[in-house]
């Protein structure tokens, strides 16, 4: 019995050691010389592809700043590997260590906080409706009997269903595997509306073939804090990321990045997203925090 108990204790200690090592991002990248950034193909001006394996955007720049400080902590130059993620696989890829830092368009909510950690909110988003400019739709109440697009694995799916129950409106959900696919459903006429974060809608409209053909309408369906995601229970890396973002907020650098990506022309077509920072976003910059979206709903 004593032998079995000792063996069990050793096994548990060994497992704990592996876990500690697995969640120590600074030690991991120092050993490998590589840091893996989770990126999105079409998350508006937050994170998107330029083609040929290149990615850019508001969150990409913030993550690059964090990685610069990660290099200082690791004491070496790191190779940055881009790992495209989707709304469905982003959390599992952070959990299993494939992705070290996810720089897309992820909503921080209480359910996700059980599985991953979030750095301070970089902007507070409002979920809205995009339609064709020729459409008469101005509210979710007018979506009865219509095909409504959204992206698989996003909080907008829950938002749609919640509003459907609350309003008694009966519409058919059609899903894109990523935001560009969801927008294509609207663009091609297979859906009459696309429900998603306003910045993502604005970004996809801005980079579409004919931006004037689309508009964002309707009431705010949900208010959601968007943040960069990292592995849970990694105190050292979380502090490094928090300190980096807090300094960017304090210095005004993050406001300048917002202007660069959401107000000024952006590559590759030099189009403007034209999406001003909300008062809630500015409040998050003034008082950095990692509160989940449920806290915003209480206000």
Regions found by a protein language model. Name each.
Residues 75-142, 282-294:
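Acidic, polar ligand-binding/catalytic clefts
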Residues 36-45, 55-72, 107, 125-183, ...:
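Bilobed "Venus flytrap"/periplasmic-binding protein-like clamshell domains
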Residues 41, 123-134, 206-245, 264-288:
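Periplasmic-binding protein-like
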Residues 61-69, 141-142, 146-147, 152-154, ...:
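Extended ligand-binding regions for polar small-molecule ligands
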Residues 22-102:
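Extracytoplasmic small-molecule ligand-binding "clamshell" domains
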Residues 30, 155-174, 212-214, 246-299:
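Ligand-binding clefts/hinges and TM-proximal coupling segments of bilobed small-molecule sensing domains
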Residues 89, 104-114, 159-166, 184-188, ...:
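A ligand-binding cleft/hinge motif common to bilobed small-molecule-binding domains
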Residues 74-86, 169-178, 218:
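Short beta-strand-to-loop elements that line the ligand-binding cleft
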């Amino acid at each position: 019995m004593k032998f079995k108990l000792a063996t069990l204790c050793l096994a548990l200690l060994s497992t704990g050691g592996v876990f500690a090592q697995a969640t120590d991002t600074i030690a991991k990248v120092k050993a490998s010389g590589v840091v893996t950034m989770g990126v999105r193909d079409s998350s508006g001006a937050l994170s998107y592809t330029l083609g040929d394996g290149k990615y850019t955007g508001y969150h990409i720049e913030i993550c690059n700043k964090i990685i610069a400080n990660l290099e200082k902590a690791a004491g070496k130059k790191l190779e940055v590997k881009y790992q495209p993620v989707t709304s469905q696989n982003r959390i599992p890829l952070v959990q299993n260590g494939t992705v070290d830092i996810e720089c897309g368009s992820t909503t921080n909510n209480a359910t996700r906080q059980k599985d991953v950690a979030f750095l301070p909110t970089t902007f507070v988003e409002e979920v809205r409706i995009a339609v064709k400019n020729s459409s008469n739709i101005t509210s979710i109440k007018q979506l009865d009997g219509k095909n409504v697009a959204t992206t698989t694995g996003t909080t907008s799916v829950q938002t749609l269903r919640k509003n459907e129950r609350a309003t008694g409106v009966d519409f058919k959900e059609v899903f894109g595997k990523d935001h560009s696919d969801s927008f294509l459903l609207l663009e091609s006429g297979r859906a009459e509306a696309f429900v998603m974060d306003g910045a993502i809608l604005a970004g996809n409209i801005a980079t579409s073939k004919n931006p004037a053909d689309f508009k964002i309408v309707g009431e705010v369906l949900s208010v959601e804090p968007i943040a960069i995601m990292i592995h849970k229970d990694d105190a050292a890396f979380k502090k490094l990321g928090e300190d980096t973002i807090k300094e960017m907020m304090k210095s005004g650098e993050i406001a300048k990045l917002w202007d660069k990506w959401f107000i000024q022309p952006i590559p590759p077509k030099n189009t403007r997203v034209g999406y001003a920072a909300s008062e809630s976003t500015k409040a998050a910059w003034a008082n950095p925090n990692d509160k989940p979206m449920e806290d915003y709903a209480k206000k």
